[in-house]
Amino acid sequence: MKEYQIHLELDRSQQNNFLYPLLFREYIYALAHDHGLNRSTIPLENGGYDNKSSSLSVKRLISRTYQRIHLSIYAKDSNPNQFIGHNNKFYSQMISEGFSVIVEIPFSLRLVAFLEGKEMAKSQNFQSIHSIFPFFENNFSHLHYVLDVLIPYPIRPEILVRTFRYWVKDASSLHLLRFFLHEYFNWNSLITPKKSNSIFSTRNPRFFLFLYNSHVYEYESIFFFLRNQSSHLRSTSSGLLFERISFYGKVEDLVQVFVNDFQDNLWLFKHPIMHYVRYQGKSVLASKDMPLLMNKWKYYLVNLWQWHFHVWSQPGRIHINHLYKDYIDFLGYLSRGRLNTLVVRSQMLENAFLIDNAMKQFETTVPIIPLIGSLTTARFCNSLGHPISKPTWADSSDSYIIDRFMRICRNLSHYHSGSSKKKSLYRIKYILRVSCVKSLVRKHKSTVRVFLKRLGSEFLEEFFTEEEHVLSLIFPRALFTSRRLYRGRVWYLDIICINDLVNHDKLEIVPN
């Protein structure tokens, strides 16, 4: 056992003046044509959002905002609080969008410098979330215990302002941020956007996602510091921030965003192996250690959240699971280790021996019950899994209805192609197929038997052969290979976000 006295200081060399581009409008126009940003492999205008958040559009919005300010000044009955408030949320949204774009610019420039320094290949596979599962297969099969962690998030706006102050120089940016948070704050909308009517949940999620990035980045930086202090090998860790917000980087200087809020000394054991993976608000910490040491890490995480982030973490947010007994619910898959016994007959002179070899594998399956719950919420089936019609699509054309169902079925098959057992996936396809037929029958006021007889049996086969057809295009000269891959596990490295129907974890995260 070795004692470490932690003294972490803030490195302010990375701070920026974020509000000045809003005050001096030409600066943001120059940034839009910056040569470094144009070379970036991940553009400033992120593809996951609409074009309203582009830098040039924000420049126009800021110009209109200045005109609004002059009109408010010269108006006789002008109210200083009327410019941005409940009576005029549009201009508040305009400024928040501009603020969101500007605060992402320094991180985009860091990304350009990082990619050029490392000479990293420009590949979309770098963004794929399915690349996590090959990592599980290669590194988790020989481990024993896993910490299944739901990262808590602050429910008070001032905590976010406190976190964000490490990135800024000008106090005016903090005041503007504090105004946005106190005026329209609804942190629950970030995790459960479907249940919230907040203006940011429907019109400007980019602003809150950046704040969530800042919050999680600070937590992970401190966690990586503790991990490196307790590891034999001080490895460099790669960090990927929340979804597709143009934030990729290398966590090398792990003392940039730290504080001195620990009141006790940390007693750390030497850990030979530890792996950490996170997506959105859920993370997995795997180790070969005994449950006692995993409980130690659970204790450290809870104290980190409470002492530094002032967030009360319920004990149920961290579970210690045995990798070969319990499942890991992560990215829409149920994953766990599996021991396969292989009997080998050994002959030595006149004696024969039967040797049992335990082969460790990492299997991934489709969580059928949560997925049926998502289909029930989307009105494709009832709570028992029986297919029902989709009345909201009754006014659409037949080709549109069939195309919508085929697209949903194809996306689910594509996302769950890495499942070890295809039986659950076949059941989901069956629900979507019958729901499509019932929707068409309801539209034409006919019966299922008559409609299928008129439509033909080819329609029923398309739902099951679509993925195999895609693999046959990839391997056109090896039909047997494509069929074998279809029955086996295939990880597609073009998937960069979780499927909406698969993302049932969102509905389970609640504030502390």
Curated annotation (Swiss-Prot):
Keyword Chloroplast: yes
The entry's keywords: Chloroplast, mRNA processing, Plastid, RNA-binding, tRNA processing
Single GO MF descriptor: RNA binding
Pfam families per record: Intron_maturas2, MatK_N
InterPro entries according to UniProt: Domain_X (IPR024937), Maturase_MatK (IPR002866), Maturase_MatK_N (IPR024942)
Gene Ontology terms: biological process: mRNA processing; RNA splicing; tRNA processing
Disulfide partners: none
Presence of the UniProt keyword tRNA processing in the record: yes
Location relative to the cell: Plastid, Chloroplast
Record-given protein name: Maturase K
Lineage: Eukaryota, Viridiplantae, Streptophyta, Embryophyta, Tracheophyta
